[in-house]
Amino acid sequence: MKHSKIAALLCALAIAGVGVPSVWAEDTSAPVVNALKEADAAAQTADTAAKAPEVNYTDALLKGLSLTLPDVEKSVESGTFKNLSPEAPKPVVEQPAPEPEPLPEPEPEPEPEPEPEPAPAAKYTADQGDAANEIDSDGTYDGMTYISTKANENALRVSMAYISAKGDTITKSGDVDDVTNSDLYGKNAALLVTHGGHGAFSDTKISTTGNGAAGAYGYSKGTYINLTDSTVSTTGNFAPAAEAAEKAMMKLANTTASTTGYGSPAIKVSKNGGIILAENSHFTTTGQESHGVYTTGDVTLTGSTVNAQATKAAVIKNNDTLSLENSTLEGNETNSVPYNIVLYSDENAIGTMGTQQFNAKDSTIISHKGGMFLVTSTHGRVTLENTTIQQDPSLPVFTVTGNDGSFGWGDPGSNGGHMQLVLVKQELTGNILVDSISDVNMNITDSSTWNGAIHIVPNAQNGAAYHTNADIFIAAGSTWNLTEDSEVTTVTNLGTINYNGHTIKLADGTVMKG
């Protein structure tokens, strides 16, 4: 024990830097002392920047007396021996100033409550007046009687319902306060089917006596009226027998319709178009400006007759179609525009070639007064197939010209007519008149024959000349029999031209003759 205490003392002295007498050089603790010296020297070398302070030998001795040799050996082996000695104070490392804490983000202002969306605008803002009787539930309504004697009122209105009816009677009297609303929306009509309603009527009698009181009126896309084995009659002014607007559809089968008032067509398609189909039906008008057909939509007649006894047989406005098959279309114009069938467009709806059409197949067209066709202020296509045309032979069968603008048919001098005429298995007799701001493109095909002549005349309003005025194509097997000298822009002949002593003068000055 005494030996251990002495060794510990020596260790403490070594720590304090006190020299060890050589007398103890052979002591068993000498290797330890040497190791301590080496460790101390290494520590001093590593920390050359800071000079160790003066050692207090008394404190070191007292500390060393408390150690045993095993303690020192253990510390040396573990590498923690230096922790038993007083160490020089480490240099003070300046701590960086703490970063200021970020200011809290301001709380976002609450978003304002969105304003309520306005109610969607109604697709149709139609003034249709009142209804004495209204059906808005699907069902069958046979043998009913519907009457209205008040102004601006429908006798029966079918709205958003699918119904069928047989043997009904619908009677309307009383005038409309504004004929525009009766024409555009069906206000004051005897029967109004509207807003997607469907009405299938058979053996039904519809009659009206008021001004602006249409017989049957269909309004809006998705609306459908079917009249079968029925009669429709109107006696007031501006009272069409059958009318559709806003893309409504109507079909008449085995039905008779008549009007007697002014401006009351038998068949009318008005604002934004629609479709009317007539099968095995008969239509008559007796009033002035009461055309057999007046359409800004599509009308098809099959096995039917139309007779306008005091005005034009038909007026086709804008890019729309009138088609006849196995039918008769008859007119007797008594006013200032002596033509039986007129094709024209508003100046803001001028069509393109072929979009406005008149088609007749296996049919008869009769004009009791005036020429047959006037094409003005539009682009149109007329197709005749195996159809009989009856008119005054001294008048042109086709007049394709501008106009003076008095009817609102475009601007004078720039409102020419542009027509494509197609003959299919057709014999046509009559002349064609075209003015200098208009043109005719004529195709004689499928063994057709044209007996007539074509004349180009100056535009009455002195408009700038169109680049072409008359181009004639004669297919193989078809024939042109000249009845007078003619002027054309070009002729393409794959068939036969019989000059009959007449000539054809081309735009380049060439004169063709037999």
Q: Locations of the language-model features?
A:
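Surface-exposed loop/turn positions within long extracellular repeat scaffolds
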Residues: Y466-I472, W480-T492, K505-L506
